[in-house]
């Protein structure tokens, strides 16, 4: 048998209140972590670096792609870096484009854990990723407007429940979506 502490390479901690516990889970260190992933041919999403520090000027305004409960934040999670935020919502809830842009990926399948996902390019190196979708409503090459429905919430890929995994990237570097929309 393996314990949860061993599985996630962590140690036991005791907290006196909820706020201290939550704060310890989401401590952010301003640094850039570069992860290189060996190609297995299973993921269409290229490896990216992660900016856990300052907000970057995107040159565009973003809206929330989904109203719901923030279930997982950007940053360190289970010994790895979570490159986006997870927003819980009911299966089939519409997901909208956070900004106008061109669809560069609209893919069904496991996709390296993202499941069915959409990637939009907004120009100037800015991209958004929408993962774990049930259905994809747009195709590669289409131009979408800000607020246009592009997919529906699901639990595809490496997922434990219905939610949207939402990422913002600038020149391949993952940014904290909470700096912009949540």
Predicted regions: what is each one?
Residues 78, 109-111, 150-158:
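Short, charged beta-turn/beta-strand-edge "cap" motif at the junction between a beta-strand
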Residues 82-83, 97-137, 162-168:
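Zn2+-dependent peptidoglycan hydrolase active-site motif and core
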Residues 1-44:
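N-terminal secretion targeting segments of exported proteins
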Residues 87, 116-120, 145-157:
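Short hydrophobic beta/alpha edge segments that flank linear recognition/processing sites
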Residues 75, 92, 108, 123-125, ...:
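Solvent-exposed coil/turn segments that connect beta secondary-structure elements
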Residues 94-105, 138-153:
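Short, well-structured beta-strand-loop connectors
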Residues 88, 139-148, 167-182:
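Acidic, glycine-rich catalytic/binding loops that coordinate metals and/or anionic ligands
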Residues 26-114:
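Surface-exposed, glycine-biased beta-strand/turn segments
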């Amino acid at each position: 048998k393996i314990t949860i502490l061993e599985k996630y390479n962590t140690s036991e901690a005791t907290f006196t209140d909820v706020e201290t516990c939550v704060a310890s889970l989401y401590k952010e260190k301003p640094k850039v972590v570069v992860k290189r992933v060996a190609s297995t041919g299973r993921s269409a999403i290229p490896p990216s670096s992660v900016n856990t520090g300052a907000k970057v000027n995107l040159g565009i305004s973003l809206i929330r792609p989904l109203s719901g409960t923030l279930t997982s934040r950007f940053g360190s999670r289970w010994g790895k870096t979570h490159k986006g935020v997870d927003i819980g919502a009911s299966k089939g809830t519409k997901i909208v484009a956070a900004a106008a842009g061109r669809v560069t990926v609209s893919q069904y399948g496991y996709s390296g854990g993202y499941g069915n996902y959409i990637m939009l390019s907004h120009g100037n190196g800015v991209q958004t990723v929408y993962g774990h979708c049930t259905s994809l409503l747009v195709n590669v090459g289409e131009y979408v407007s800000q607020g246009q429905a592009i997919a529906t919430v699901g639990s595809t890929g490496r997922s434990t429940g219905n939610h949207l995994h939402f990422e913002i990237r600038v020149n391949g570097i993952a940014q904290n979506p909470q700096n912009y929309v949540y």
